[in-house]
A protein has these predicted regions:
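Active-site-adjacent alpha-helix immediately C-terminal to a catalytic or transition-state-stabilizing loop
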Residues: 62, 125-179
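Catalytic metal-binding/acid-base residues of hydrolase active sites
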Residues: 11, 59, 82-83, 147
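Phosphate-handling substructures
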Residues: 70-125
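Alpha-helical elements of Rossmann-like donor-binding domains used by nucleotide-donor carbohydrate transfer enzymes
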Residues: 38, 42, 63, 67, ...
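Short aromatic-enriched loop/helix-cap "lid" or pocket-rim segments at secondary-structure transitions
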Residues: 16-19, 65, 88-92, 155
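Short beta-strand scaffold positions
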Residues: 55-56, 122, 143-144
Length: 179
């Protein structure tokens, strides 16, 4: 079996303000763009090989992927299933709010107009199942979001609710996953 890489997008305006982005588009900061360029440079210099970059269509991930692609020459395309979870009424609220933290414990809750953890898991697990089938002949870099990173990690590792909630990937961190 093969492998793939996961990269979280660069820093956004709302990351800097400690707000929940979710499915709301929050643009990269200048620092976030610099992080993406540094990641592209590191991928190139490390000799990491990939056939294609798949990215969330939200601008923070799309811009990160396109910067990495321009530096590495790896082609890229949008993959809608990598869109961050829609946190409904919690979008743009403080990330460390205790009400939001409590709401996240309800995996089947849609956050009043959003998407449940179970719905998110279905689309991410289905995508990873497809990538696994192709992994012997094709290596991907997925550029997405921290909520997606949690789901990817849970695909490979059993996690308690607390471990799941606390798991995170830093902006522009590269993580390798082996099937």
């Amino acid at each position: 079996m093969g492998h793939f890489y996961f990269v979280r997008h660069g820093q956004t305006v709302w990351n800097a303000e400690n707000k929940i982005c979710g499915a709301t588009d929050s643009p990269l900061t200048e620092y976030g763009r610099a992080q993406a360029a540094e990641t592209g440079k590191n991928i190139l210099e490390s000799g990491m090989k990939a056939d294609e970059i798949l990215y969330s269509p939200l601008s923070r991930a799309a811009d990160t992927a396109k910067i990495i692609s321009s530096m590495t020459g790896i082609p890229c395309r949008a993959e809608a299933r990598l869109t961050e979870q829609n946190f409904g009424k919690w979008e743009s609220t403080p990330r460390d709010g205790k009400d939001f933290k409590k709401a996240k414990e309800s995996f089947a809750c849609r956050y009043e107009g959003g998407e449940s953890m179970l719905q998110l898991a279905q689309r991410i697990y289905n995508l990873l199942d497809e990538i696994k089938v192709e992994s012997d002949r094709k290596t991907y870099i997925l550029v997405a979001h921290n909520g997606i990173a949690r789901m990817v990690q849970s695909y490979f590792q059993d996690m308690t609710n607390e471990e799941f909630a606390s798991f995170g990937v830093k902006n522009c961190q590269v993580v390798r996953y082996d099937f």
